[in-house]
Every structure is written in C-alpha cells, then in structure tokens.
Amino acid sequence: MAARGRFPERVVYIWGESGAGKTHLLKAFAELCAARGAAYGTAAEYEPQARRPILVLDDIEGLAEEGQADLFNAFNDHAFTFLLVAATSAPRDVPLRRDLATRLATGLTYRLHALTDAEKGAALAAHARVRGFGLNDDVASYLLTHARRDMGSLIAALDALDRYSLETGRIVTVPLLKAALDESRA
C-alpha cells in the first residue's frame, strides 16, 4: 500500500496502550513514505498550516486547540491524501473536538495490543539473531523480569548486552546479563 502510494482509505487511526508499538509503526511508515512528503511528528510538534500530502501524527490526543481546528479544516479542504494517527484511546473516546474525532473515525481503526511475554521473548530472539548472536530462553526470561518491560527498553538492553558481550569476549548468558545490568545501573 505505502510503497505504491495508493491508500484504500484516507485515514488510518491506530490506538492502544503505551508500549504497544504505535510510535514504531508510525515512524516506519513515515520513513517508507518519506519520498512522497511524509514525516513523523507528534501532535505537540504539529504546525498549523504546514501541509503535507501524507500526515503522520503520533499522540493525537495531545493536539492543541489551534491544531485541532487546522486539522479539521485540512480534512474539509482535502489538504492531504492520507492521514495516519495514533492515540491511546479509540476515536470515540479521544479528548478532541467532536467534529475532528468524528472525521478521524471515518477511516480504518486498528487497536494494537502490547505483546505477551512469549511474543516479547520471540521478538528479542529475532533481534538477537539479526545482531549475530543467539538468545536462549533463560536469558530472555531474565531480561523480561529484571529490565523495563516496554519493547524499546528491552531492545536497548539487548543491544547493550550485545556490546558488553563483545567488549568482554564472553557469550551471552544469564550471568553476563546480570553483570551488564549491574554495570548499567552503577
């Protein structure tokens, strides 16, 4: 869809709890569509009258009143060909002007759920493989119980573990992970 520049809907609204991956998806989409004028931004960074053919707005519930009015007018003026937004609540519950919330609800709406521990473990193992090392279940389980649990923090911890493993010349094990976490907290 994005690679061809054709969108079946004018609006896609993604919502879910913090850490579910909304920002990751929006940034990846904006990067994929950058040649067509897309750029990632948060609602706090939204500049009224700054028109782009593809708008990608994160944390839409933080859009100021002036931005809400401008985005509503952009809808009516067909000032963009595609709008991708993310929020922590569904369109009917988002704290925005009712007319804007109604417009946002006219397209596709997807709810993202946070990954389960098993899915996080699988994602960490896949990330480790890409980085060139294996991650056994014991290491993944320890990481899930002793580090911040959002995927961004877990990936950062895994990357730090990889660097620590290379610096010390040791393979990735639970004792190495403990040492790496202790060092990062010191």
Give the role of each language-model region.
Residues P8-L25:
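Walker A/P-loop nucleotide-binding motif
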Residues P91-A105:
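Short regulatory helix/loop adjacent to the ATP-binding pocket of P-loop NTPases
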Residues S141-T145, G152-L166:
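C-terminal helical "lid" of AAA+/P-loop NTPase domains
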Residues S165-E183:
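Conserved C-terminal helix/linker of AAA+ ATPases
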